[in-house]
């Protein structure tokens, strides 16, 4: 996962100055993970290789379809992942740097890009951890962040930031 975390760190570095690029990067990272999963597991790659179709193959193979999960609370959360993937793909299409904007531009703010990147990171982490569990991989324990480097969310936010 360190390589994936580095890619998301790079995406976060562009959030303020280039939010469109950050959204595109978040979508591209997810798409790469999903396509790698499909290839590594010798699954049939869908004809349309956008984010949604490749995620559909991955989630079915990992047993993440809502009907295959018994706990209703967990079903709700995992269904939320589907919405996140759909939203990130749509945001990339309508506001990302991957497509022209047409007549009407989308006013993408850094906070929107940050939401997309962080949400994509959550999806990526869950998918990779589920994949690891499926194959029986146990990653080495992570080195905890030293207390001097830890920052609470409230310390990062500007008091003027509207929610």
Which stretches of residues belong to each language-model region?
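Amphipathic alpha-helical interface elements
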Residues: 1-86, 130-145, 159, 163
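Charge-enriched, short contiguous segments at helix-coil
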Residues: 80-136
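Intrinsically disordered, charged low-complexity linkers and terminal tails
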Residues: 111-112, 116-119, 147, 151, ...
């Amino acid at each position: 996962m360190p390589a994936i975390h580095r890619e998301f760190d790079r995406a976060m570095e562009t959030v303020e100055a280039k939010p469109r690029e950050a959204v595109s990067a978040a979508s591209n990272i997810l798409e790469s993970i999903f396509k790698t999963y499909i290839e590594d597991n010798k699954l049939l790659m869908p004809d349309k290789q956008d984010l949604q179709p490749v995620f559909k193959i991955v989630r079915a193979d990992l047993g993440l379809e809502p009907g295959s999960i018994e706990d209703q609370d967990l079903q709700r959360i995992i269904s939320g992942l589907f919405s996140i993937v759909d939203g990130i793909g749509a945001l990339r299409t309508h506001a990302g740097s991957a497509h022209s904007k047409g007549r009407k531009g989308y006013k993408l703010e850094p906070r929107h890009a940050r939401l997309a990147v962080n949400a994509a990171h959550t999806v990526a982490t869950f998918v990779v951890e589920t994949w690891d569990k499926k194959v029986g991989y146990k990653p080495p324990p992570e080195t905890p962040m030293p207390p001097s480097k830890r920052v609470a969310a409230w310390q990062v936010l500007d008091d003027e930031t509207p929610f």
